[in-house]
Amino acid sequence: MDNEPVEVKMLDNFFSESAVIAEMKTNSNLNLDFLAANHGITADMLEVYYKFSKFKYECGMYTEAETMLGHYLSVVQPHSASHLGALWGRLACRIVQAKWGESLEDLHAVKEAIEVRSISSVDQLRQRAWLMHWGLFVYMNRGAEGVEKLAYLFSEKASLLFTLILSIAFHASKTYNVTLV
């Protein structure tokens, strides 16, 4: 695009260098300090890059957005505020492109990110609900095997939830003298 921000052009050039990509894949210790010192990449530049990938997604440029989000995820720390959003974005890009294998990988990455993040129970529940929603697209397009995996995704926490509900119901019945059916 001719109207890409300068930061986006610089990062696109950075990510197009095969030696840089190879180094990033082999060295998991690359962080923003390293990128700033050795390549002049700052957090602000990455933020512009992330926002521009969202712009490309909103314009229907899913392949470009997916590529940009993949690059962004390769340098951003998993605990950063935008990491989960970038995972969701790449998942959405791959779903609308019907890339079911990659979508499944991203679905699991999102699930793992939800589980390890320190967020409120309500936010975690909301994220899991969205995970199930997007999971429908991924699993229903994988045939019978996908339906089985979807059922597992829905039931994975079900036994814990069922136990919790029964425990609360039992205590409530004793406290309020109610008979459980």
Give the residues covered by each predicted segment.
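Extended alpha-helical scaffold regions
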Residues: M1-V181
